[in-house]
Amino acid sequence: MEIINPIPVELNLNELQEKLHMKPGKQWAQVLQLVESAAPLIEAKVVYKTCYIEEKYTDGVQLDGIRLTSPVLGKKLAESVRVFPYVLTIGPKLEEEEKNFTEYIQQYCLDIIGNVALITARRSFEEQLKKKYKLEKMARLGPGSLKAWPIHEQKPLFSIIGDVESAIGVTLNESFLMIPRKSISGIYFPTEIPFEACQLCPREDCPSRRAPFDARQAAEYEPKDTDH
């Protein structure tokens, strides 16, 4: 288990402005004030583990004696040897600050600020992985991001990494959602072929979409009809 704490986070104001669909003006000036007050509350950190795949199956892999079940993992990691399960968070303080505001627009802006901070921290972590392990290209998958890797798979993923709560303060609730809310988890893996989980997700109105839906590729992971 390795911990990076803190992960430096410098918010990209252009990205934030785009996600808020705002133009320069009075309202944007108010957002900049929120950014200034929010910045000290962002405490980005990550815990991860370097794992070598012990067993490979059509519907998953085994890491450190623990099986992860997902046909997407089974296929995407078929040629992989080493992978990096991780949990990353920006901590609870920004989320707690959001509750102190009564106006919806302020709460919404702080929520988006948190999202941008989380994405920024994740990108920074990815670059650190590439540099440390001399990797050119990487892709990632996370439990709950696709039907083919359901959210209850968070539990074995956390078990593989170790004591995530002691390391960075992230826990799972009974629905396998992470606390603090602004946290992400998954597996990074080296790849020669660019891949985004978005390619397998049909949701059309997702504001976080990074790649177009690939219906043909997604069909490969649909449950097969076994009736005769």
Which stretches of residues belong to each language-model region?
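Active-site helix-to-loop segments that bind/position phosphate- or nucleotide-bearing substrates
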Residues: M1-T102, Q106, E222-H228
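Conserved active-site and cofactor/substrate-binding residues in soluble primary-metabolism enzymes
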Residues: A29, Q33, V116, T120, ...
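Structural signal for hydrophobic packing residues in well-ordered secondary-structure cores
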Residues: A38-I42, L129, Y133, P202-D205
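Metal/cofactor-centered catalytic core regions of large enzymes
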Residues: P71-K75, D205, R210-F213
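Conserved mixed alpha/beta catalytic, RNA-binding, or beta-rich assembly cores of soluble enzyme
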Residues: L77-G142, L146
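Short conserved micro-motifs at the rims of enzyme active sites and ligand-binding pockets
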Residues: E98, R210-Q217
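Short C-terminal domain-edge/linker segments immediately following a structured domain
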Residues: N115-A121, P202, Q217-Y221
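Short terminal or interdomain "cap/linker" segment that borders an active site or interface and mediates
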Residues: E136-R210, A219-H228
